[in-house]
């Protein structure tokens, strides 16, 4: 059985996006056809945050989804937040188009359903910034756009 989810990201500014997820059986979830627009060219941190709450804008989403109480790191690191998806890269027109496969899940205790995806202002330093904030947020800056992940 293939599970599907979708997230529509919006913010106070021009940044918008759509992420479609699929997961077959117990395999890792796949983000397909991710399109983010209205970004400055370059890298931007991309994370799943813990709460599905956007009542006060993206800040209500809380910290990165981290059910195992790990430190912030990059998507290729074994020891990291579940929500650490690394960076997306926007082209000269401010558009990022990517597909990702990650250790995230659409079922079980580490499910991302009902949580919030956030695109950040700056690049994520993947926990290698040499300060305490790097180990929490990757120094990725303000939250440009966000949306709650729901079943499709």
UniProtKB/Swiss-Prot annotation:
Gene3D superfamilies: Superoxide dismutase, copper/zinc binding domain (2.60.40.200)
Example of a GO cellular component annotation carried by this entry: nucleus
Domain of life assignment: Eukaryota
SUPFAM superfamilies registered for this protein in UniProt: Cu,Zn superoxide dismutase-like
Primary role: Destroys radicals which are normally produced within the cells and which are toxic to biological systems.
Binding site for Zn(2+): 64, 72, 81, 84
Organism in which the protein naturally occurs: Xiphias gladius (Swordfish)
Molecular-function GO terms, alphabetical: copper ion binding; superoxide dismutase activity
InterPro entries associated with the record: SOD-like_Cu/Zn_dom_sf, SOD_Cu/Zn_/chaperone, SOD_Cu/Zn_BS, SOD_Cu_Zn_dom
Assembly and binders: Homodimer.
Residue positions bearing lipid (S-palmitoyl cysteine): 7
Essential cofactor(s): Cu cation; Zn(2+)
Keywords: Antioxidant, Copper, Cytoplasm, Disulfide bond, Lipoprotein, Metal-binding, Nucleus, Oxidoreductase, Palmitate, Zinc
Recorded family membership: Belongs to the Cu-Zn superoxide dismutase family.
EC category: oxidoreductase
Catalytic activity: 2 superoxide + 2 H(+) = H2O2 + O2
Protein name: Superoxide dismutase [Cu-Zn]
Cofactor binding annotation: Binds 1 copper ion per subunit.
Alphabetical list of CDD domains matching this protein: Cu-Zn_Superoxide_Dismutase
UniProt EC number: 1.15.1.1
Annotated disulfide bonds: 58-146
Binding annotation for Cu cation: 47, 49, 64, 120
